[in-house]
Each structure stands twice: as C-alpha cells, then as structure tokens.
C-alpha cells in the first residue's frame, strides 16, 4: 500500500491535514515524531480519539503540542467501515517556525511511494 501525503495548515491553535475524498474514513493510529527518529523509537497512539470533519484531520494542542520550531514526520492510518479492506496510510512532513506550519518534501526513506513514481537515472 503506497503512502499518501497531503497539505498541512494551522487553524487557530490546531494543526490540520486536508483529507481528499474523506468519505467515512477515521484515524486508527497516529505518530508524530521529530524528523530523523528511527523506526524503533517512533511513538504511535493507537486510540487517538481524533476525528475527520469537513475533510480535515485537526490535531489540537491538548493532543500534541508542537514546539515553536522544528521538523516532524506525521504518520496516520485511516480506516473505513464501508471500505474495511482499503485502509489509507498518510505520511506528511510538517515544519514549524515563526508561528506557522508548512509542508516539507519527504525522502524515499520517509515515505513509500507508488511503484513507477520514483525517478531512476540510467
């Protein structure tokens, strides 16, 4: 299953991720880790209690307080009752600085891309 990625924005104090074609998908787990954290050291919450509303998954500071600056890799799995055999995994590079949040490009080690989308030099 290739990973999806999406845009990040700040809405009030919340950090929000746009979810295209959200349907009835909801988060089953989420990991927010500083960029460069090894796979073994990543921390995941398997009952996040977060919901997708209006095509956005928003993380309030009461769930995770992003510091004033840094880069984070946010990973989450969305599941659907209607499409229970088609979970969706997202990996998003989130940068924080100067009171704003922004996307940064992920490396091939940070995200699994669909076969054929990786450019290979000949």
Residue ranges and their predicted role:
Residues 55-92:
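Extracytoplasmic/surface-exposed domains of secreted proteins
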Residues 8, 50, 80-82:
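Assembly/interface hotspot detector across virion components, adhesins/toxins, and nucleic-acid enzymes
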Residues 39-53:
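Solvent-exposed serine/threonine-rich low-complexity stretches and specific carbohydrate-binding patches
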Residues 10, 52, 65-69, 97:
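Surface-exposed coil/turn segments at beta-strand junctions on protein surfaces, enriched
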Residues 15, 42-44, 64, 70, ...:
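Short non-domain terminal segments
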Residues 3-5, 18-20, 47, 54, ...:
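Short, flexible coil/linker segments at or flanking structured domains
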Residues 1-38, 88-122:
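N-terminal non-catalytic regions of secreted/periplasmic and cell-surface proteins
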């Amino acid at each position: 299953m290739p990973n999806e990625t999406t845009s990040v924005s700040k809405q009030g104090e919340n950090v929000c991720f746009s979810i295209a074609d959200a349907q009835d998908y909801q988060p089953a787990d989420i990991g927010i880790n500083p960029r460069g954290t090894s796979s073994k050291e990543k921390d995941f919450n398997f009952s996040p209690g977060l919901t997708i509303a209006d095509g956005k998954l928003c993380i309030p500071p009461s769930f995770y307080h992003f510091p004033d600056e840094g880069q984070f890799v946010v990973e989450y799995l969305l599941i659907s009752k209607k499409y229970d055999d088609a979970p969706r995994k997202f990996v998003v590079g989130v940068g924080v600085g100067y009171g704003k949040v922004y996307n940064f490009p992920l490396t091939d080690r940070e995200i699994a891309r669909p076969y054929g989308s990786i450019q290979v030099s000949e």
